[in-house]
Amino acid sequence: YLRVATTVVRHEESAGDPWGRAETANRVSVMAEEDGALKVVGQTPDLAQGERIFSSRFVGRRGFLVTFRQVDPFFTLDLSNPRDPKVVGELKIPGFSTYIHPVDENHLLTIGSYVNPDGGWQGRAIKLSLFDVSDFAAPKEKFSQLVGSSYASSEAQYDHRAFNYFPEKGLLAVPFVDWNAAASGDGYWSSFVSELRVFHIDTQAGITGRGALSMSDVYRTERYPDWTYSWSPQVRRSVMADDFVYAVTDAGLRVANIADLSAPLKTVRFEPNAP
């Protein structure tokens, strides 16, 4: 069976508006091959009208879905009967998750954005959450942690390959970018923060920061016939091996011991870009 989570947009006529009004609804469809064609054999009712899907995850006979408009409805789905998928539980919390990662049978680790329920830009941050789904009808956000300022972002929020969970040690590494307006120094890049943030994940103790491996001083140089430009790229990927973690940007890579991320052991800078 193929399971697909979709946001459906319908355009409806609206008095005084020549373009009409767009209405959204969300659903999970189960598809199977019948008579040589792929057909929908089961489908949930429309969910969270007026919102759109930000993330989904299917694990065995269970499914998880996150939609968003102002708060984050987190849905649990029973997919044991492909022809009759059902919503079992729902949890509403501020913000939204953009990637869902199973930790074990009863816990999910997510990354996304915290959004102030009152609206506005201030108060936003990267959000890590640990969900308890042992009671499938009543999921709980067991732990959460806000990371960074309103300017913060992480490539892991929109590319799951940047989300690096190392289950043997219970460690999570994610790229982190922020803007520190209070930083001293001249020029734009003195306030730019590019790091690999590392967290310890424990289903009983929660989410604990282990520190950051900074890449802010690893610059990429672009050379042109009449001028040269250097800039600090964001962290794109990471690798964890034994007691070491590697941070990778478009400008180079750096390694540190996880026990002391503030003391890099080696930095390799890539060659400047030639025209």
Describe the predicted segments one by one.
Residues 1-275:
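Feature marking well-ordered beta-strand scaffolds used for ligand recognition
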